[in-house]
UniProtKB/Swiss-Prot annotation:
<keyword id="KW-0687">Ribonucleoprotein</keyword>
<dbReference type="GO" id="GO:0006412">
    <property type="term" value="P:translation"/>
</dbReference>
<dbReference type="Pfam" id="PF01783">
    <property type="entry name" value="Ribosomal_L32p"/>
</dbReference>
<comment type="similarity">
    <text>Belongs to the bacterial ribosomal protein bL32 family.</text>
</comment>
<dbReference type="InterPro" id="IPR002677">
    <property type="entry name" value="Ribosomal_bL32"/>
</dbReference>
<dbReference type="GO" id="GO:0003735">
    <property type="term" value="F:structural constituent of ribosome"/>
</dbReference>
<dbReference type="InterPro" id="IPR011332">
    <property type="entry name" value="Ribosomal_zn-bd"/>
</dbReference>
<dbReference type="GO" id="GO:0015934">
    <property type="term" value="C:large ribosomal subunit"/>
</dbReference>
<keyword id="KW-0689">Ribosomal protein</keyword>
<protein>
    <recommendedName>
        <fullName>Large ribosomal subunit protein bL32</fullName>
    </recommendedName>
</protein>
<dbReference type="InterPro" id="IPR044957">
    <property type="entry name" value="Ribosomal_bL32_bact"/>
</dbReference>
């Protein structure tokens, strides 16, 4: 199994880790429904799936 030849200092380790950061999710508000959702994602609202302000799927319950 491989082992490091030299000890990595805390400073060097931390400099490498500066690129790993948490990002805030970008949230949009639909102009039609007023629902908050993630950008570039479809979302459900009152039994309908919306994407870019248009109804993609209208979920109708079948009556037997």
């Amino acid at each position: 199994m491989a082992h490091p030849k030299r000890k990595i200092s805390k400073t060097r380790r931390d400099k490498r880790r500066t690129h790993y950061k948490a990002t805030v999710a970008q949230i949009a508000t639909c102009p039609i429904t007023g629902e908050a959702h993630l950008y570039h994602r479809a979302y459900w609202h009152e039994g309908k799936m919306y994407y870019r302000g248009q109804v993609v799927i209208d979920k109708q319950t079948a009556v037997a």
